[in-house]
Amino acid sequence: MIESFKRIYDNRHEYIGKWKEKHPDRKIMGYMCTSMPEEIIYAANALPIRILGGHESQNVSQQHMMGTFCPFSRDVLAQGLLGKYDYLDALGITHTCQHIYQAYESWVLHKNIKSFYIPTPNTSQTPHALPYLRGQLKLFLEKLEDWTGRKIGENDLRRGIEIVDTTRKLMKQIYEMRKSESPPISGLDSMLMVVAAQMSDKEEFNTILEDVIKNELPGRKAKATPSSRLMLIGSEHDDVKFIEMVENLDAIIVIDDHCTGSRYFWNTTEQNEDALTDIANRYIKKPPCPIKDFPVRKRTAHIVNLANEWNVAGVIEIQQKFCDPHELDRVAVSKALEKAGFPILNLEADVTMPVGPFRIRVEAFLEILSSEELF
């Protein structure tokens, strides 16, 4: 049921605690970036779960991270230092931004936890990226074999691909339904769906998705009256209060591009080569975040295409305060959207602070969209 998305998100630690009771022999790896190859972790019979912040003020990360690092990275580290994720057997990360990598290093240092780092390519726009990444995934696989005491074969990898790709296909099917004039699911429930998928056992979660698609979404309307169709883009964003505030106004978010949204699941695995090569190829081709989108900026065309396909009236770009990659990306993305005829509202957020101050700006933006629709 759709309510399951929020229940898993709100009770993520209790969910994993119960899962661990049912699967005492399986290990759990937390990860901090959506470039982490979950397929290989499932192939090792372990459970990958995404680590996110708690959206609460805290005072435990200041001595470990600079104040000019993004609030999200400091919030994530605080979760580890406060013991919220003490059930993890390991922590994993790929090449990512400096801020979240510092959270990872400090967590590993102070919690003395088994760690895995995959130095994924800085950019996918080179012919060397695929063979390089395949080699790094092979090394990661071998380390997982040592960690779990389990040999990982081709069939295991294919099973991991099947589990994760099924989740991706089902969530994309739901996103496609949001193209309709009266979307059957809100932007908030869509975001909760994606983060719940990141925080749960996908074999269990896939049955929930199938049930929602078959029994809940047909004929359903997320909003009773027509509303301004918005796109949400920017850095990591799982702020329930913000999305709730936007959709309580005369608006509905119908599409997004961020790592707790479509970017996480947008492409599936093309099965053309051996499994490791196929997995590497999938991550090379996934919609990039700003830190990997060079020398040619490809994100802008992808974002504009989404805005067109989902027929949005305007775009809200919300970035974490001090998020350098998105700060550098913001101007190019904004210009591309404006050139394509999409008004954009740029906001800078602190995930640990109230969202009330944004309400006036969002209301003003919606008034502009309404006046443009009249003419």
Where are the language model's segments positioned?
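A charged, amphipathic alpha-helical module
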Residues: 1-27, 138, 142-267, 292
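An N-terminal, globular interaction/scaffold subdomain
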Residues: 33-84, 89, 103, 108
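Redox- and metal-dependent alpha/beta enzyme cores, enriched for Fe-S-associated oxidoreductases
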Residues: 34-35, 39-52, 234-304
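Short, acidic/turn-prone active-site loops that include or flank metal/cofactor-
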Residues: 52-58, 120-123, 257-262, 349-350
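N-terminal beta-loop-helix "entrance" segment that forms/cooperates
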Residues: 55-72, 264-279, 361
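Acidic/His-rich segments in extracytoplasmic proteins that coordinate ligands and/or metal ions
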Residues: 75-146
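A short, acidic, amphipathic alpha-helical segment used as a generic capping/interface helix at domain edges
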Residues: 80, 294-311, 328-329
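Peripheral docking tails and interdomain loops at the edges
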Residues: 331-375
